[in-house]
From Swiss-Prot:
Alphabetical keyword list: Cell membrane, Glycoprotein, Ion transport, Membrane, Sodium, Sodium transport, Symport, Transmembrane, Transmembrane helix, Transport
Residue ranges annotated as Extracellular topological domain: 1-15, 73-86, 150-161, 206-239, 305-336, 411-415, 460-519
Superkingdom of the source species: Eukaryota
Transmembrane region(s): 16-36, 52-72, 87-107, 129-149, 162-182, 185-205, 240-260, 284-304, 337-357, 390-410, 416-436, 439-459, 520-540
Subcellular location, record wording: Apical cell membrane
Source organism of this protein record: Xenopus tropicalis
Single GO MF annotation: monocarboxylate:sodium symporter activity
Cytoplasmic compartment spans: 37-51, 108-128, 183-184, 261-283, 358-389, 437-438, 541-620
Catalysed reactions, as listed in the record: (S)-lactate(out) + 2 Na(+)(out) = (S)-lactate(in) + 2 Na(+)(in); propanoate(out) + 2 Na(+)(out) = propanoate(in) + 2 Na(+)(in); pyruvate(out) + 2 Na(+)(out) = pyruvate(in) + 2 Na(+)(in); acetate(out) + 2 Na(+)(out) = acetate(in) + 2 Na(+)(in)
Protein name from the UniProt record: Sodium-coupled monocarboxylate transporter 1
Membrane disposition: Multi-pass membrane protein
GO biological process, one term: chloride transport
Function, as annotated: Acts as an electrogenic sodium (Na(+)) and chloride (Cl-)-dependent sodium-coupled solute transporter, including transport of monocarboxylates (short-chain fatty acids including L-lactate, D-lactate, pyruvate, acetate, propionate, valerate and butyrate), mocarboxylate drugs (nicotinate, benzoate, salicylate and 5-aminosalicylate) and ketone bodies (beta-D-hydroxybutyrate, acetoacetate and alpha-ketoisocaproate), with a Na(+):substrate stoichiometry of between 4:1 and 2:1. Catalyzes passive carrier mediated diffusion of iodide.
Glycosylation sites: 219, 481, 488
Length: 620
């Protein structure tokens, strides 16, 4: 039975574990600042010299977006809404296949540093600038959320000053990211994934022991309606269903893994294309492992608190504080383990923030500085990259203040990626899949998708969906012992949300329809609008007349399974030709270099003749 004030507090050993995690992360950054001669060029700093291998990159990919938002938000999601969130296991598999077979081949073939370099090659400088600005806005906002999340956990379980913890998070992360570049980020991610799994495991194992085995946990979850894996309701207004998670989640996470600089920068830093693809598929195993840990933690939390919900009882002020509360409650007799869990949440944030800062520095240097200051030496560009990392670290710390105003961390984080990531995904899809889409169509499509997704996203924040669409599960106070309270809390209740939802009379008609769209469909909506509008605008503005460089498009050879399937069916002399999907080869086309593993060239340094031919994606 849970009673107020009955949880433990941080001990010396907890602080030791926590400090050790920070120290090791910082040491890794210092090591890679000097290892191998240090970060002599911007390519060394931003891309690790394009010499990374699959396993560390895979773990880094897993850690980058399995942040404190996952550590704190997903168990609370399962506790309140049930285990339907586990359907994301299917979504992750679909996303990895799309990313590795559609987007990775094109980006790797071009040997680019910033994904937005592709937009200039395929379209023009203005499209590249638009994509870069949207990415910077998206990433700074998201990073603010994931900095705030562990600070909230620390504040809840240790009494640390909330904003002091926010600053500490940003400073430590910015330090090792600035010192060691991409290699430091990747290898600290490897270490931090281990900490995340260890932290989750300590909570799960102890919960199983406390509850007498995994059986009682599953039994409590079943009778509490938490094992609600399947709900095929097609209603797009319902917060989570099979379709919102699989369809909406696929668009949201493809925007992250397929075209987001933070992820793409890692796998195109691999030394071969095979290693790059392998890193994505190994990363899938990591995603499944972290998801399983988070879901099991949520079910264990419900089993322990099924008769006395700490949130409704006001032992915690927000659902995202439930996991740190649980860790102190059940691990208080084991010095060091509460510190391990807080380190788990903190590790998730350090990995995500460092990835974001490194990506922000990359797009700023490659897209906003290098094209206009080409006379700068590589040494100077390396120092500029480090300075840019410092600046973005400070900006992200400042933006963490907004996170305190955005409600649930998990939904807020995915909503941001939906509102901005969806239109960006549509933009890259227009360039890679549709050879007739021109620059005008790309701009109109991007802005249309962004306007629509921003409209519904902001509307949903102002007028949150009602409980009828979010479908929270009942929580109980029957087992609480409120000896200091006059009221007798002995009934099953739903947490009150009236302070978050305006009165029905003040809600416009769109509030219960358009603004109540599942947050996972924000990305789907933005992508579809961007693609449809972009295609129509291009057709109306003469897009069919252009002849696009085939290196910028998806080809049949880019599908690895097609290469194996048809390898024995090619006629002699055809091996060097490239068949572009949905594209008729013209007599003026010539065979283009298909790129090699570990591309070392920089297209911005190509000869002026080649540059004119490839600029805007049109062959002169």
């Amino acid at each position: 039975m849970v009673t107020p004030g009955n949880i433990g507090s941080f001990t010396v050993w907890d602080y030791v574990v926590f400090a050790l995690m920070l120290l090791i992360s910082a040491v890794i950054g210092i090591y890679y600042a000097f290892a191998g001669g240090g970060q002599k060029t911007s390519k060394d700093f931003l891309m690790g010299g394009r010499s990374m291998t699959a396993v560390p990159v895979a773990l880094s990919l897993t850690a980058s977006f399995m942040s404190a938002v996952t550590v704190l938000g997903t168990p609370a999601e399962v506790y309140r809404f049930g285990s339907m969130f586990s359907i994301f296991a299917f979504t992750y598999a679909i996303v990895v296949v799309i990313s590795s077979e559609v987007f990775l081949p094109v980006f790797y073939r071009l040997g680019i540093t910033s994904t937005y370099e592709y937009l200039e090659l395929r379209f023009n400088k203005f499209v590249r600038l638009l994509g870069t600005i949207l990415f910077i806005i998206q990433t700074v906002l998201y990073t603010g959320i994931v900095i705030y999340a562990p600070a909230l956990a620390l504040n809840q379980v240790t009494g640390f000053d909330l904003w002091g913890a926010v600053v500490a998070t940003g400073v430590v992360c910015t330090f090792y990211c600035t010192m060691g570049g991409l290699k430091a980020v990747v290898w600290t991610d490897v270490f931090q994934v281990g900490i995340m799994v260890a932290g989750f495991s300590s909570v799960i194992i102890r919960a199983v022991v406390v509850q007498g085995g995994i059986g009682p946990i599953l039994n409590d979850s079943y009778y509490g309606d938490r094992l609600n894996f399947w709900d095929f309701t097609p209603n797009p207004l319902q917060r989570h269903s099979f379709w919102t998670i699989v369809v909406g989640g696929t668009f949201t996470w493809t925007g992250i893994y397929g075209v987001n600089q933070s992820q793409v920068q890692r796998y195109i830093a691999c030394k071969t294309r095979f290693q790059a693809k392998l890193s994505l598929y190994i990363n899938l195993l990591g995603l499944w492992a972290i998801l399983a840990c988070a879901v099991l933690s949520g079910l264990a939390m419900y089993s322990i608190y099924k008769d006395c919900d700490p949130w409704t009882a006001q032992f915690v002020s927000a659902p995202d504080q439930l996991m740190p509360y649980l860790s102190l409650d059940i691990l208080r007799d084991y010095p060091g383990l509460p510190g391990l869990f807080v380190s788990c949440a903190y590790s998730g944030t350090l990995s995500t923030v460092s990835s974001s800062i490194n990506a922000l520095a990359a797009v700023t240097v490659e897209d906003l500085i290098k094209p206009y200051f080409r006379s700068l030496s590589e040494t100077k560009m390396s120092w500029i990259s480090k300075g840019t990392s410092l600046i973005y670290g400070a900006i992200c710390i400042a933006m963490a203040g907004l996170a305190s105003l955005m409600g649930g961390l998990l939904q807020a984080a995915l909503s941001i990626f939906g509102m901005v990531g969806g239109p960006l995904l549509g933009l890259f899809a227009l360039g890679i899949i549709f050879p007739f889409v021109n620059s005008l169509g790309a701009v109109i499509g991007l802005l249309s998708g962004f306007a629509i997704s921003l409209w519904v996203g902001i509307g949903s924040q102002i007028y949150p969906p009602t409980a009828s669409s979010s479908l929270p599960k009942p929580l109980s106070l029957e087992g609480c012992n409120f000896t200091s309270f006059e009221s007798n809390w002995t009934t099953t209740v739903m947490p009150m949300m009236t302070t978050l939802i305006p009165e029905v009379s003040s809600r416009p008609e769109l509030a219960d329809s358009w603004y109540s769209l599942s947050y996972l469909y924000f990305s789907t909506l933005g992508t579809i609008v961007a693609v449809v509008v972009g295609v129509i605008a291009s057709l109306l503005s003469g897009g069919l007349k252009q002849n696009v460089n085939r290196d910028f498009l998806l080809t049949s050879q880019d599908f690895s399974y097609l290469n194996v399937l048809f390898s024995n069916c090619k006629k002699k002399g055809q091996e060097e030709k490239v068949e572009v999907l949905n594209w008729k080869m013209r007599s003026t086309d010539t065979d283009m270099d298909q790129g090699t593993d570990n591309p070392a060239f920089n297209h911005m340094e190509m000869s002026s003749t080649e540059k004119k031919e490839k600029m805007n994606g049109i062959i002169a």
